[in-house]
Amino acid sequence: MVRLEKNDPLMLARQLPIKSVALILAGGRGTRLKDLTIKRAKPAVHFGGKFRIIDFALSNCINSGIRRIGVITQYQSHTLVQHIQRGWSFFSEEMNEFVDLLPAQQRVHGENWYRGTADAVTQNLDIISRYKAEYVVILAGDHIYKQDYSRMLIDHVEKGARCTVACMPVPIEEASAFGVMAVDENEKIIEFVEKPANPPAMPTDPTKSLASMGIYVFDAAYLYELLEEDDRNENSSHDFGKDIIPKITEAGMAYAHPFPLSCVQSDPNAEPYWRDVGTLEAYWKANLDLASVTPELDMYDQNWPIRTHMESLPPAKFVQDRSGSHGMTLNSLVSGGCIISGSVVVQSVLFPRVRVNSFCNIDSAVLLPDVWVGRSCRLRRCVIDRACVIPEGMVIGENAEEDARRFYRSEEGIVLVTRDMLRKLGHKQER
């Protein structure tokens, strides 16, 4: 493979994304989000008032200069496919730009869907190889972060790596959920273990482990060779973290890329932001953080915009009811099409077309699109799924036993409410 000159970072930053294709793994079920992902894949879950989770990986690609993207789907893909078709159809075929949807089609192994993350790429190799890319960027479609992939590509080329893994320190008590690595002084990965029961600590900080973020850069030809070999191995689980990365590490061809080098943030002194919103509490907390005075993730950075499907909606409206009570909000995100009538909304996130009727108190709540809240309701520490109709006078988040009986309540006390749960309680969901 022809290597670009290493003494011109600006040239590398322009050329490497053009020579690359990004593959976003977007087929995950997200079972830890409970009923929130029964009817949609985790990357299609709403986030941040107007976005879907996958919008962050897609926006990172566009902002990094990568305009050849494959989205690999599987579980409950309709909502995700519809969102991408509606919101990400602005690419130019004449310029060889595209977002290619790659659903599981059981072409390779007949009876099998994707057997692992690596197999998801393997089953689409006949399509991916036609992209004729020199580099392949593998991404998870279910994380919240801002990253300039061109900087990671530069790091990959300058180190002469065949595979580069983005990494960041995590608390050692949380590291069992990740692939954990050890690196030498040149950032070559010398050991890699997927989800170890006893994660090794970093030599420089015994309270942290160096974790893989599930973001990889490969030399394309090398990746295809590895995947074809892995596909023939009956003992493999066909997973990047469990099989592919450890094998490359043993061969001495894998390098680490510290996430702070490519993390995009407005405040250079802030901690690099990357979240796996895989649990209900993490999802709720990450949404509410955006409504705080100084959120950890800057959504207002015009130099690194997060794109999404834009609906034609009127502005949010706050009105007083007939009794004279004013609609008020504080430290909240309220999206287009919302109407707050004679109620108070505090430290909450309201997605498009939410209607809050009179005498309600909404505190620390996430209300997904088209939620209707009847009069005199009190909602606290909860996530209300799309199009739920909350009946008049309902109280959520104040009585742990009652919440657990009627809805799903996490160990941390976050309550998830869906239309099916409300129907089982006898509440009609049509209005």
Curated annotation (Swiss-Prot):
PROSITE patterns: ADP_GLC_PYROPHOSPH_1 (PS00808), ADP_GLC_PYROPHOSPH_2 (PS00809). Keywords: Allosteric enzyme, ATP-binding, Carbohydrate metabolism, Glycogen biosynthesis, Glycogen metabolism, Nucleotide-binding, Nucleotidyltransferase, Transferase. One of its GO terms (biological process) is glycogen biosynthetic process. Beta-D-fructose 1,6-bisphosphate binds at residues 39, 429-431. It comes from the Bacteria. It catalyses: alpha-D-glucose 1-phosphate + ATP + H(+) = ADP-alpha-D-glucose + diphosphate. Allosterically activated by fructose-1,6-bisphosphate (F16BP) and inhibited by AMP. The record marks 74, 113 as: Could play a key role in the communication between the regulatory and the substrate sites. CDD domains: ADP_Glucose_PP, LbH_G1P_AT_C. AMP binds at residues 40, 46, 52, 130, 386. One of its GO terms (molecular function) is glucose-1-phosphate adenylyltransferase activity. Pathway: Glycan biosynthesis; glycogen biosynthesis. Its EC number is 2.7.7.27. Signal peptide: none annotated. InterPro entries: ADP-Glc_PPase (IPR011831), ADP_Glu_pyroP_CS (IPR005836), GlgC_bac (IPR023049), GlmU/GlgC-like_hexapep (IPR056818), NTP_transferase_dom (IPR005835), Nucleotide-diphossugar_trans (IPR029044), Trimer_LpxA-like_sf (IPR011004). PANTHER family: GLUCOSE-1-PHOSPHATE ADENYLYLTRANSFERASE, GLUCOSE-1-PHOSPHATE ADENYLYLTRANSFERASE-RELATED. Homotetramer. Belongs to the bacterial/plant glucose-1-phosphate adenylyltransferase family. HAMAP family: GlgC (MF_00624). Involved in the biosynthesis of ADP-glucose, a building block required for the elongation reactions to produce glycogen. Catalyzes the reaction between ATP and alpha-D-glucose 1-phosphate (G1P) to produce pyrophosphate and ADP-Glc. NCBIfam families: glgC, PRK00725.1, PRK00844.1. This is Glucose-1-phosphate adenylyltransferase.
